[in-house]
Swiss-Prot record:
Binds multiple chlorophylls and provides some of the ligands for the Ca-4Mn-5O cluster of the oxygen-evolving complex. It may also provide a ligand for a Cl- that is required for oxygen evolution. PSII binds additional chlorophylls, carotenoids and specific lipids. The chain crosses the membrane at residues 69-93, 134-155, 178-200, 255-275, 291-312, 447-471. It comes from Amborella trichopoda. Pfam families: PSII. One of the components of the core complex of photosystem II (PSII). It binds chlorophyll and helps catalyze the primary light-induced photochemical processes of PSII. PSII is a light-driven water:plastoquinone oxidoreductase, using light energy to abstract electrons from H(2)O, generating O(2) and a proton gradient subsequently used for ATP formation. This is Photosystem II CP43 reaction center protein. One of its GO terms (molecular function) is electron transporter, transferring electrons within the cyclic electron transport pathway of photosynthesis activity. NCBIfam families: psbC (TIGR01153).
Length: 473
């Protein structure tokens, strides 16, 4: 393939400590990158880069399948999922597979099928990755022009963007079809403590769906993370699916406008930086979603949220002391505020004590006890159901607190338990990965902009001390 620009001009900073080492004929002299820079050597070899990406997809899908089967093999149906360190089975259960009323697992076979399907898929992807990395054409432009590309070809790049958007839209609709037609999904808000149901009455009103985007991200509002019914979640996926597919068709049929051609840097590294920036945002949003949202991430599978565990503790002791004769409506706590119940500044009746800061929690085990002005005293006295007591006691003792060595509970607790909530793991991992992706975004954006401007920040490698030293080997 004809190289459109000098690699040496664009990528002058990477150097080998030992210039004689070449790997598979792709040495630093011809690519501008040393062996350890991995796929950077394949920037202009579209066929080999395809192999690297397909092989990477194979590794991802292999992990999903293997980890899925590992979790199935270790799964004990009598214990809650969140007590067993599972992170994949809760996702499958949320999609309505293998669970019944109250989130009880009634069939693990769908989980086994999921693991096997992913393993088989990974074998296909692995073969494709090895084929394109080792045997297939180095570049696709000559033999398969539809799959070939040049990074500077703005029209081709937006066509590829369009194809990706259409695939994302199809993915959004897969969830919609599962919820509407193929067995439904798990709804933690179903009466009596959650159940799998088909979502029939979708929310398609743009004012509701896009209203989430206009909300404040702070307490009581919570931006899109505040979504608390499945009709809105599935309806939102209908909107997303249509937007992605229509946007994809638009990008395939059009060329970038002049303002876009001027505004963006059009190089492989620039596209990498845009992608890393987007993934970083996804990571931060996912972190907040799994930490605070108990509708998309039902507490039956992921364990309670932090606020939920705290409110569950207040509720559990209210139930106990009320049975022992306490008047929970008027009992005073050590601070002079209500011991069990108090009023918020806006007048709602909320739980008293330290958990007052989590007054805006909504959870399916608690909402039936609310009236028009917050918690309803008469319902608390007469209407508490056994399943609500059991669930709050369970959630009280499974707060999403814990350390890396799997010792759960409050840091000052002497009777520590071997429990860390999947919410802790998933929120922390997505925050950390989101942060690293953001750093990668800044790094590659800076390099891409510098290269486009015709200069490169970095050490002047011609006079680097290590070049005058004896090679290690």
């Amino acid at each position: 393939m004809k190289t459109l620009y000098s690699l040496r001009r664009f990528y002058p900073v990477e150097t080998l400590f030992n210039g004689t080492l070449a790997l598979a004929g792709r040495d630093q002299e011809t690519t501008g990158f040393a062996w350890w820079a991995g796929n950077a050597r394949l920037i202009n070899l579209s066929g080999k880069l395809l192999g690297a990406h397909v092989a990477h997809a194979g590794l991802i899908v292999f992990w999903a399948g293997a980890m899925n089967l590992f979790e199935v093999a270790h799964f004990v149906p009598e214990k809650p999922m969140y007590e067993q360190g599972l992170i994949l089975l809760p996702h499958l259960a949320t999609l309505g597979w293998g669970v019944g009323p109250g989130g009880e697992v009634i069939d693990t076979f769908p989980y086994f099928v999921s693991g096997v399907l992913h393993l088989i898929s990974s074998a296909v992807l692995g073969f494709g990755g090895i084929y394109h990395a080792l045997l297939g054409p180095e570049t696709l432009e000559e033999s398969f022009p539809f799959f070939g590309y040049v990074w500077k070809d703005r029209n081709k790049m937006t066509t590829i963007l369009g194809i990706h958007l259409i695939l994302l839209g199809v993915g959004a609709f897969l969830l919609v079809f599962k919820a509407l037609y193929f067995g439904g999904v798990y709804d933690t808000w179903a009466p009596g403590g959650g159940d799998v149901r088909k979502i029939t009455n979708l929310t398609l009103s743009p004012s509701v769906i896009f209203g989430y985007l206009l909300k404040s991200p702070f307490g009581g509002e919570g931006w899109i993370v505040s979504v608390d019914d499945l009709e809105d979640i599935i309806g939102g996926h209908v909107w997303l699916g249509f937007i992605c597919i229509l946007g994809g068709i638009w990008h395939i049929l059009t060329k970038p406008f002049a303002w876009a051609r001027r505004a963006f840097v059009w190089s492989g590294e620039a596209y990498l930086s845009y992608s890393l920036g987007a993934l970083s945002i996804f990571g931060f949003i996912a972190c907040c979603f799994v930490w605070f949202n108990n509708t998309a991430y039902p507490s039956e599978f992921y364990g309670p949220t932090g606020p939920e565990a705290s409110q569950a503790q207040a509720f559990t002791f209210l139930v106990r002391d009320q049975r022992l004769g306490a008047n929970v409506g008027s009992a005073q706590g050590p601070t002079g505020l209500g011991k069990y119940l108090m009023r918020s500044p806006t007048g709602e009746v909320i739980f008293g004590g330290e958990t007052m800061r989590f007054w805006d929690l909504r959870a399916p085990w608690l909402e039936p006890l609310r009236g028009p002005n917050g918690l309803d005293l008469s319902r608390l006295k007469k209407d508490i159901q056994p399943w609500q007591e059991r669930r709050s006691a369970e959630y009280m003792t499974h707060a999403p607190l814990g350390s890396l060595n799997s010792v759960g509970g409050v840091a000052t607790e002497i009777n520590a338990v071997n429990y860390v909530s999947p919410r802790s793991w998933l929120a922390t991992s997505h925050f950390v990965l989101g942060f690293f992706l953001f750093v990668g975004h800044l790094w590659h954006a800076g390099r891409a902009r510098a290269a486009a401007a015709g200069f490169e920040k970095g050490i002047d490698r011609d006079f680097e001390p290590v070049l005058s030293m004896t090679p290690l080997n």
